[in-house]
Structure formats: C-alpha cells, structure tokens
C-alpha cells in the first residue's frame, strides 16, 4: 500500500536517514520503534509528502509520491506529533473545515463529519471549542482530522505521547479499531505499545533501519531457544546431567518450594530444535525424572530492540542466567 525505497535524507552535513526501505501492506498496523532522535518523525514526514527525500522514492498504492503528489496525498491521513488544531473552532466546525480542504464532496461533508465524530468518540464534545478540551480529547480530534476524506493509509506520529494512562488506553483502542479498515503506520518509543497494537515492527536507530519483522516472526525466530522446566529430581543430580547435553549452552536453577522438585532455565541452540527437546526427554527418561512442566520461551521485543539500538547493551536474556 505504501512503500519507502532506498530513502536517504540529509540536512546539510547531517544524515537523518540512510538508505531506508520498507513496505506497509494493506490492512496492517505497522509500528515504527526507536529512541528519541532515531529518525522516526523524519521518516513519517517523508512518507506523507511533508518533506522530500534527498534520494530514494516513496510509493503510495503504486504511485510515486513526488510525481503524483495530489493523488497520493488523498490516500494518506496524517497526525503529526503536534496536532494541527485551531483552538477557536468547535470540533464539528474544524472537521468540516478539514473536509473542505481535502475537497470532500460538499453534499457528503455533513454525514462524513458525523461518522468521524462517532468513530473517534467525540459526540459529547463536538459542539465545544477545541481550546477548551483536555489533552486526550485534543488527540482524538487530531486522529479525527486524519480520517477526513476517508484515506486508505493513516500515519500517526507518537499518538499517545503526553497522555495520562486512561487516555493512552483509549487512544490505543481507537488505533486498534482503525486498523481493521485502514493501513496504519505509527511511531512510538514504547515497546509495550508496539507489541500490543502491531502486526509488524520496524526499528530505527540513528537513521538506519536496523530491524524489520512481523510480530509473529519475532515470536518464532531467534538464535537461542529457552526452555523453562519443572522436573521431579533433586537439583544436585539434575544440573550436571543437563549440562552434559550437546544442545544446552547454559543451565540455571530457579528457586523451588521443595528439594524434590527442581525448576530450571535452559538456554539451547535454536538450530537444534526439535532435537533439543528430544535429547532432554531421553535424558530424563534414563534418569527416571518425570517432567512436571516444560515451557518454550523466545526473544522478546525488548531483547531485539536493545540488540538493534546498542551493540554494547547488556542482553537481558543473558543476564537472567547469572
């Protein structure tokens, strides 16, 4: 639906983006994750045509954004980091104004605005001046203006920043609902937000796209497999036996309520799966040590983010074995 191809952006001698390429398919919520200054806002400004790239190409529904700016921008709704609101206008009047700017057919504006007001939960404040609204409602109005003209793609720049916990939950629910009928790209520096809402994640670091994957791929891939097991055998006998397995890199004993049951965390070579589990079962059968629980764990988004943004950062997974 919308795609960046080898996009670079320079401000004089400063390179804000370097050779960034990615695609947001139709009907997906895509999260752009990165620290402050990573290049998230620059990326979104280029995606929406507010900034031209120094080099590279932006395609919207197969059309080049620079060559077909008018047609492409009709397909994009944009919520910048600071919503473009007019405090002296009422919510309803403002949305009518935005519809006129986007050249919505005049006979359809009234019904279109009321539909947006309902979708964004603004019915109770539609008659009020925007300047008198709370931060949460102002953000809802910002999302609402991005829906004017019924664009196929919504681009939201840190839509929950500065909101209180209840407002954050409400805006996230709204984004999830919009994702059912739109392609949504939104930026955030909150890991939990990306995990909760997105089908796909992109990690930017210092202007470079360091990581790109579906959330399902993230759950299923990784160099390391971790197994958490509860085994009916004393720790002193069990740990040396587990360490003898070729596929096991590290073993850590976890606290238990009884010495007859051992709780362990195993770090195994992911390339050995499913052989790792087979080796474990054979070993424990030979030791007459029943397995009470076996849970497979994968790399978290936090682990991937730390690895992508700082090669020298401590690995929280590795730390768990200390």
Listing of model-derived features with the role each one plays in the protein:
Residues 269-322:
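C-terminal coupling/interaction segments
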Residues 2-4, 9-205, 209-211:
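ABC transporter nucleotide-binding domains
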Residues 34, 250-253, 296:
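Hydrophobic/anchoring residues in structured secondary elements
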Residues 172-267:
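ABC transporter nucleotide-binding domain
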Residues 114, 132, 257-258, 299:
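Positions that flank functional sites
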């Amino acid at each position: 639906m919308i795609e960046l191809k080898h996009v670079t952006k320079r401000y004089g001698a400063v390179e804000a983006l370097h050779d960034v390429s990615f695609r947001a398919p139709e009907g997906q919520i895509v999260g752009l994750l990165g620290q402050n200054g990573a290049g998230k806002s620059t990326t979104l400004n280029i995606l929406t045509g507010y900034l031209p790239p120094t080099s590279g190409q932006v395609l919207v529904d197969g059309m080049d954004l620079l060559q077909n700016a008018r047609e492409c921008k009709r397909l994009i709704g944009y919520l910048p980091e600071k919503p473009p609101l007019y405090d002296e206008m009422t919510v309803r009047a403002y949305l009518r104004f935005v519809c006129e700017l986007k050249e919505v057919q005049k006979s359809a504006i009234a019904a279109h605005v009321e539909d947006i007001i309902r979708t964004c939960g603004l019915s109770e404040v539609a008659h009020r001046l925007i300047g008198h609204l709370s931060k949460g409602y102002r953000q809802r109005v910002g999302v609402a203006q991005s829906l004017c003209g019924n664009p196929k793609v919504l681009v939201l720049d840190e839509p929950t920043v500065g909101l209180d916990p209840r407002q954050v939950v409400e805006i996230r629910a709204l984004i999830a609902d919009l994702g059912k009928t739109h392609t949504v790209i939104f930026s955030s520096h909150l890991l939990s937000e990306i995990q909760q809402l997105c089908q796909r994640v992109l990690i930017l670091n210092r202007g470079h796209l360091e990581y790109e994957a579906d959330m399902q791929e993230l759950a299923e891939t990784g160099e390391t497999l971790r197994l958490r097991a509860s085994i009916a055998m004393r720790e002193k006998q069990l740990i040396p036996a587990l360490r003898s397995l070729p596929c096991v890199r590290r073993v850590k004993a976890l606290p238990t309520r009884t010495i007859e049951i051992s709780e362990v965390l195993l770090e195994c070579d992911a390339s050995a799966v499913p052989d790792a589990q087979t080796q474990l079962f054979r070993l424990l059968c030979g030791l007459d040590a029943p397995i009470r629980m076996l849970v497979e764990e994968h790399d978290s988004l936090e682990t991937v983010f730390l690895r992508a943004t700082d090669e020298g950062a401590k690995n929280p997974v590795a730390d768990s074995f200390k």
